[in-house]
Every structure is written in structure tokens, then in C-alpha cells.
Amino acid sequence: MIPDVSHALTWLEAHPKALKGIRRGIERETLRVTADGQLASTGHPESLGAALTHQWITTDFAEALLEFITPVDGDIDHLLTFLRDIHRYTARKLGDERMWPLSMPCFIGAEQDIELAKYGSSNIGRFKTLYREGLKNRYGALMQTISGVHYNFSLPLEFWQAWAGVTDEKSGKEEISAGYFRLIRNYYRFGWVIPYLFGASPAICASFLQGRETALPFERNDKGMCYLPYATSLRLSDLGYTNKSQSNLGITFNDLHTYVAGLKRAIQTPSEEYAALGLKDGDRHLQLNTNVLQIENELYAPIRPKRVTRAGESPSDALLRGGIEYIEVRSLDINPFSPIGVDAVQARFLDLFLIWCVLADAPEMSSDELLCTRKNWNRVILEGRKPGQTIGMGCNDTREPLEKVGKDLFTDLRRVAEVLDGKDSTEYQQVCDELVASFDDPSLTFSARILQAMKEGGIGGVGLELAERYREMLQNEPLELLTEEQLSEEGAASWVRQRELELKDKLSFEEYLALHGGQ
């Protein structure tokens, strides 16, 4: 089941310097809620700066959905402290509001009460809001208020020089991209280990279903909670943030050019379903266009190849220009046991697993096999902790006990951990020891622990209690890396940058839209 990685691990042990200089970044989403857990109806706090142009504090789909973005960092503890500083500063600016500590929202009334994120009057700001209007009309606003954590990861040039024989990023872009696509294919095959260990959405509030049809055999309790007894991450299920209409796009992850061609095809393919929604209601735009994807970012994926874009450049054009620069892992639920939604154990595990995904052999993957991997993920998402659970590989019918596959994987990860730790540390090895125990004892997983708490206190009760505890904790902690002055200066500067964008616009919004894929 697990590919034989022994040769690659032996190579890694002989090249420990190849892993010096791993770079990471984190994006964390969280809903602003009132003291009684209702979605905040206030605008994005002005004191936090302009969501359009702030480097670290922005919004995602909704005006009440905060997103915190760290700079790229070579040190996990430093990275998490930076993220915590942003949380501390924000907690002090939110007045009586709190940050919801769970991926799944709970006390949301009518979908029409969810206000879309606003970014000012510039063309790009209006474009971003219209894109969200399209998402709302296509998939419903409720689904878009589900929050998660994204982990961005890149290996140093020294790794690619030693592993793939490249000299520099420019001349080696094809080889480096091929290495990252190998990582992505292995992620699709084995990444279900992430929701198994860290999924933290085994239950939803009954209100979340709001008349939506579901074939899932939910159990309900007297606290208005629907749950599956062995589920790990309903956020990643069809109930959560996925997109069924995209499953037949045929996008594959075998090489840069076919991947980009698939993406470009999807943003140019008309959709009858979305055409039926209409483009406009009178003068009001309803979506950017009626294609399968309005823009490339609409493609739902548990992992994405990325390159930082230049002004006016699409994500796929950036990839064609420079190859894959880093990958974005998108399968992490909010960690409810951390005030900042993610912790060092998770970050170190992802380092280990993503390195393993690059080292392990990864045969090319057809779009059919990609759909088959979804079945394995679904099994873990909906009943990953079920006693005796088995797991397959791609479209192959043979299955092995999940417990065995997990432990086999950790045998490999332990060797990667020893290389990362070197002689002076045991941090990565400790992560292996802590997490491998979850395969013998599923009650140690995030989903089992949070489900137990939710059965006792209800989802709303648990969410509110944690939100209040973290609010108090973060409000009272001093900043460690940033200063109040730096943060308020960035806030003020972001408003100046937004205003400059608004003054610079020469085109009407209709002209701008026509140039950027609008209809």
C-alpha cells in the first residue's frame, strides 16, 4: 500500500542539508461572532485597516469572515508567534465580539443575513465583491462561511539541486514543478491522514442543514446537534466546502502544461446551470460570468500548486512563467484546541508528510483515479474512526486496515524526523511519537476529543466557551514580535493604499470587467 521509500530515505539521510531552509506560511480564517454566538453584523473593523490592501489582516467570503496571513517564514515557532500576535492585536480591536473557534458555523440565521466582504470602490475591490456574489448565487452563502487553515510550504533550492540536479530556479522550473506535482499526487493518495488526525468537524448544528437534502445517516441529540459517530471532518464532505459540479472537469496533476490547460478550459467553458442564474438583475451584477469557474480560484481543491502573482497576472499564467514556487495545503480544519486555530505539532507533521510526498514514488494519475482517491478521503471524512476501518489506494479494490497504513507511514516519517531534528533536537521525532498513537487509539484524534465535548455541551456551548476563553487569553497577552505601533501603522497605510487604488482607476467597472474575464 505505502510505496517503498527506503532508497529515497537513505538518500535523504546522506543529504541532511537539503532540508535546511524550508519555507512556510499560514492563512487562518475565523468568523466574528457576538457574545451569544450570532454572526457579527458589523463591518470589518476600521481600526484593523483596509481588508483589500492589509498585508496580514483581511477578509475571506463574508464581511464577518476574518483571514489572517503570515509572511513567509523559515522557523515554525517564529511563524506561529507572528500569527498569535495578529490574533492578540485583533482580539483587542473587536470590542465585545469574539473569533469563532470552530470550522463549522452554528448560529447563522437566514442566508441573506450574511453580508459579502466589501473592499471599497476601486475596480479591483468591486470585482472581488462581485466574485463573492457569484459564489453566493452558485453555492449558497452558508457554505462559504465554513473556515479552515491553509499551510503554505516550499522546499529550498538546495533540495532541488541535490534531488533533481537543477542549478537554479529559472532553468530548473520544469524539474522543480515535476517534483511538486509528485508531492500533490501522493497527497491525493495519502493525504486523508490529515483529516484522520486533525479533522475537527464531526458534527454540525441542525440549523446548518436548513432544509438541505442529505443522505448522510446523522444521529441527533437534544442539543440541536447532528453528528456521525466516527466522522472526522464534515467540512471536507459534500455538506461542506466542496463543489460537485467541478468533479468532472478532468483537471490532472501530472505536469504543468496539462494542469494549466485544464484550469484555463474550466474558466472558458460555459455552464448551463450558471447561465440559468442570469448575469444581471436589472443593473445589479449576479456573477462575473456564467462559466464553470468564474475565475481560477473558484476551483475547489484540497491542495494547490502556487506561485506569487505579479500585478494583473492570473495564477495559471504565473505558474507558466516561473513554475511551481510553493504548495498550499487546504485540508486543515480549525484546531479548536489552539487559540490561533493551528499548532506546532500540526505544522511539524505537515513538514514531515509533505517531504515524504516528494520522496515517495508517485505514478501519473488519470482524472478517473483522482475521483477514486476522493472515495478514500470520504471514507475517512465520514467514518475514519470506525473500528476496523480499511483504506484503499486509488481505483484498486484491495484494502488494508487504516491502522496499519497509518503506522507504516509513520515508520517512514520517523526517519524523515531524525534528519530534520539532526543531533541537537527531538522535536519532529516527538511529533511522530505523539501522533502515531492515534492509530491504535482513535479517541486521541481531534475529532474524537471535540465530539466528546460537543456531546456534553453542544456545539454552540463548546464554541462559545472556547471563544470566550481564547478572547480573554489573547486580549491579555503582550505582543512578542510585532508592536502595537507597527500594527496600527500597517492599518493606516493599508487605507492609504486602498485610496490610491481608487484614485488610479481610469476604466469604468464595466470596461474593467470585460478585460478580466467578466461577461
UniProtKB/Swiss-Prot annotation:
The chemistry this enzyme catalyses reads: L-cysteine + L-glutamate + ATP = gamma-L-glutamyl-L-cysteine + ADP + phosphate + H(+)
Could you tell me which SUPFAM superfamilies the record lists for this protein? Glutamine synthetase/guanido kinase
List the keywords (alphabetical).
Answer: ATP-binding, Glutathione biosynthesis, Ligase, Nucleotide-binding
What Gene Ontology terms describe what this protein does at the molecular function level?
ATP binding; glutamate-cysteine ligase activity; metal ion binding
Disulfide pairs here are: none
Pfam families linked? Glu_cys_ligase (PF04262)
Q: Biological process (GO) annotations?
A: glutathione biosynthetic process
As recorded in UniProt, its EC number(s) are 6.3.2.2
Write down the Gene3D superfamilies for this protein, in alphabetical order. 3.30.590.20
Per the record, the pathway is: Sulfur metabolism; glutathione biosynthesis; glutathione from L-cysteine and L-glutamate: step 1/2
Q: Which GO terms describe its cellular component?
A: cytosol
**Superkingdom, taxonomy of origin:** Bacteria
Record-linked PANTHER family: GLUTAMATE--CYSTEINE LIGASE
The record ties this protein, via HAMAP family, to: Glu_cys_ligase (MF_00578)
Q: Which family does it belong to?
A: Belongs to the glutamate--cysteine ligase type 1 family. Type 1 subfamily.
Specify the protein name.
Answer: Glutamate--cysteine ligase
